[in-house]
Amino acid sequence: MVKAKKLVFKWSLLVFSFFTLSLFLVSCTENVREIKSSSVINELFPNFWVFITHLLAFFILLTLMIFLFWKPTQRFLNNRKNLLEAQIKQANELEKQARNLLEESNQRHEKALIVSKEIVDQANYEALQLKSEIEKTANRQANLMIFQARQEIEKERRSLKEQSIKESVELAMLAAQELILKKIDQKSDREFIDKFIRDLEANETEDD
C-alpha cells in the first residue's frame, strides 16, 4: 500500500513537471499568443528536436527536483520515522522496565509480609515458651519452698518431741529420786505417780 502511494506520487509529479515545463517553454517563444486547447499539442511538439529538447529539459528538471526536494524530503521522513520508531522502542523498553519494577516490588512486598508473619509467629512462640518456662520455674520454686517448709516443720516437730522425751526422762529421774529420798508410803507413791503422769500428759499436750 505504501509503495503504491509512492509510485502514484512519483508519476503525478512527473506529469505535472512535464506539462509545467512545456507551458513555460511555449510562453517563452518570440511570438507570444494565447494558448488554445486545439493548438497545445502543436505548440508543444512542432518537430522532433523540440520534442527532444522538451524531454531533456523535463529530465533535467526532474533530476533537480529529485535531488533538491525529493531526496531531502525522503531523508527527513526517514529520519522522522527512525526517530518515532526509536521513541516507540524506548517507550516499550520503559514500559517493560516499569512492569518488571512493579513485579519486583510486588514480590518484595509479598516476601516482606511473609517474613514479618514469620517474625511475629516466632515471637509468639518464644513468648509462649518463656511463659511456660517461667511457670515451670515458679512451680518448682514453690514446690521447693513447700518441701523445705515441711522439712523445717518436721524437723521442729522431731526436735520438740525429742526435747519433750528428754524432759519427761528428766522428770521421771527427779521423781524417782524424790521417791527414794522421801520414802513415802504406797498411797503417797500412787498419788505422786498419778500426779506425775498428769503433768507429763499436760506437757505433751502443750508441745502438740
UniProtKB/Swiss-Prot annotation:
Molecular function GO terms recorded: proton-transporting ATP synthase activity, rotational mechanism
Lipidation (N-palmitoyl cysteine): 28
Cellular component GO terms held in the UniProt record: plasma membrane; proton-transporting ATP synthase complex
Membrane topology per record: Single-pass membrane protein
Stretches assigned to coiled coil: none
InterPro entries membership: ATP_synth_B-like_membr_sf, ATP_synth_b/b'su_bac/chlpt, ATP_synth_F0_bsu_bac, ATP_synthase_B_chain
PROSITE patterns: PROKAR_LIPOPROTEIN (PS51257)
Main location as per UniProt: membrane
Localization of this protein: Cell membrane
Top-level taxon of origin: Bacteria
Signal peptide interval: 1-27
Lipid-carrying residues in chain (S-diacylglycerol cysteine): 28
Segments crossing the lipid bilayer: 49-69
SUPFAM superfamilies the UniProt entry points to: F1F0 ATP synthase subunit B, membrane domain
UniProtKB keywords: ATP synthesis, Cell membrane, CF(0), Hydrogen ion transport, Ion transport, Lipoprotein, Membrane, Palmitate, Signal, Transmembrane, Transmembrane helix, Transport
Family: Belongs to the ATPase B chain family.
SUBUNIT field: F-type ATPases have 2 components, F(1) - the catalytic core - and F(0) - the membrane proton channel. F(1) has five subunits: alpha(3), beta(3), gamma(1), delta(1), epsilon(1). F(0) has three main subunits: a(1), b(2) and c(10-14). The alpha and beta chains form an alternating ring which encloses part of the gamma chain. F(1) is attached to F(0) by a central stalk formed by the gamma and epsilon chains, while a peripheral stalk is formed by the delta and b chains.
Its biological purpose: F(1)F(0) ATP synthase produces ATP from ADP in the presence of a proton or sodium gradient. F-type ATPases consist of two structural domains, F(1) containing the extramembraneous catalytic core and F(0) containing the membrane proton channel, linked together by a central stalk and a peripheral stalk. During catalysis, ATP synthesis in the catalytic domain of F(1) is coupled via a rotary mechanism of the central stalk subunits to proton translocation.
Name assigned to this protein: ATP synthase subunit b
Source organism per UniProt: Mycoplasma genitalium (strain ATCC 33530 / DSM 19775 / NCTC 10195 / G37)
Taxonomic path: Bacteria, Bacillati, Mycoplasmatota, Mycoplasmoidales, Mycoplasmoidaceae
